[in-house]
């Protein structure tokens, strides 16, 4: 039976988030290949991996085949996503009917069959925090002007939603969308000057969040079906049951819950979700460290009931 493939990219302490993603995949019922592109040293939870050609490492984990691929592109990992997905599909998983990408600060809360359905017959996406971007919004009009300068025709100019680049599910029939996304990111470098950072300029810049803006511009250039959830799909708003995305610099594996709460930033839903997937099959923390994290999160959440920044 052909199985879908899941990918992520990480460097630095984001390997702790990637371990939480693996644990959540396992809890969801996913069994198959999980491809990790990484920069720097292998994480501690990859130590039992076996060496394979091209310097890759493979670890089997109760039905999940974790493949570690060393990378060192000259651009920020977030701008490397479509390139990595295309390479993984071609070189590692050419038989996969679908490929998924999730940022390493995301965990999955739903059963895997829901994830499979999400990318059935269309591209699986989740709306971003700032999700409404109507067809005649000035930013979108600027994108239209830029597309004309690139001799690209926007076939779906009436898109009105703005989607997160932290998650995408692509069926094989829509594989060419990844090529378009990759191409637009490369063209964006002529505007931004480089692709070595997540952000560029200010919120009104043509490309502010480069990979994410390029993703949404690519959606204007194709009539591919979009299978989307609202922003609650990543726990940006309450009521979500699909994914949980710990956006921003306050990552749950770094702790600091009490300090942040006293500054008016209570623990996010994503912080709570991450700790739910911190124990198995990969123990991310020692028992004592996890107990402390959970205790401080509980206290910080209590403080947040009475004090938070508006």
Q: Where do the model's predicted regions map?
A:
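GT-A fold catalytic core of metal-dependent nucleotide-sugar glycosyltransferases
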Residues: 82-135
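A structural signal for short, well-ordered beta-strand segments and their strand-loop junctions
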Residues: 35-37, 98-103, 108, 124-125, ...
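Conserved glycosyltransferase catalytic-site signature
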Residues: 18-19, 78, 82, 162-165, ...
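Secondary-structure boundary elements
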Residues: 27-31, 90-98, 103, 171-178, ...
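A glycosyltransferase accessory/donor-loop signature
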Residues: 1-2, 155-158, 175-310
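Short, flexible/disordered intra-domain loops and linkers
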Residues: 42-51, 135-139, 199-204
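Conserved catalytic core of nucleotide-sugar-dependent glycosyltransferases
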Residues: 113-183
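N-terminal anchoring/stem segment of glycosyltransferases
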Residues: 1-76, 90-95, 285-310
């Amino acid at each position: 039976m052909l199985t879908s493939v899941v990918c992520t990219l990480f460097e630095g302490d984001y390997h702790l988030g990637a371990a939480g993603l693996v644990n959540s995949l396992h809890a969801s019922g996913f069994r198959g290949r999980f491809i990790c592109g990484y920069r720097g040293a292998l994480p501690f939870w990859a130590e039992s991996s076996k060496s394979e050609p091209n310097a890759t490492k493979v670890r089997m984990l109760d039905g999940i085949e974790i493949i570690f691929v060393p990378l060192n592109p000259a651009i920020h990992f977030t701008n490397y996503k479509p390139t990595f997905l295309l390479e993984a599909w071609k070189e590692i998983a050419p038989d996969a009917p679908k490929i998924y990408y999730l940022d390493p600060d995301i965990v999955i809360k739903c059963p895997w069959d829901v994830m499979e359905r999400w990318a059935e017959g269309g591209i699986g996406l989740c709306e971003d925090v700032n999700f409404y971007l109507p067809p005649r919004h000035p930013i979108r009009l600027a994108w239209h002007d830029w597309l004309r300068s690139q001799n690209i025709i926007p076939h779906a100019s009436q898109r009105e939603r703005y989607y997160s680049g932290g998650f995408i599910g692509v069926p094989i029939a829509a594989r060419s969308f990844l090529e378009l996304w990759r191409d637009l990111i490369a063209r964006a470098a002529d505007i931004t000057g480089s692709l070595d950072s997540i952000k560029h300029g200010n919120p009104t810049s043509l490309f502010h969040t480069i990979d994410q803006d390029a993703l949404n511009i690519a959606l204007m250039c194709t009539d591919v079906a979009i299978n989307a959830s609202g922003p609650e799909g990543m726990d940006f708003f309450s009521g979500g049951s699909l994914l949980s995305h710990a956006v921003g610099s306050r990552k749950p594996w770094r702790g600091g819950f009490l300090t942040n709460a006293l500054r008016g930033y209570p623990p996010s839903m994503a912080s709570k979700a991450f700790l739910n997937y911190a124990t198995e099959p990969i123990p991310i923390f020692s028992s004592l460290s996890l107990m402390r994290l959970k205790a401080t999160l509980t206290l910080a959440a209590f403080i947040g009931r009475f004090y938070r920044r508006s």
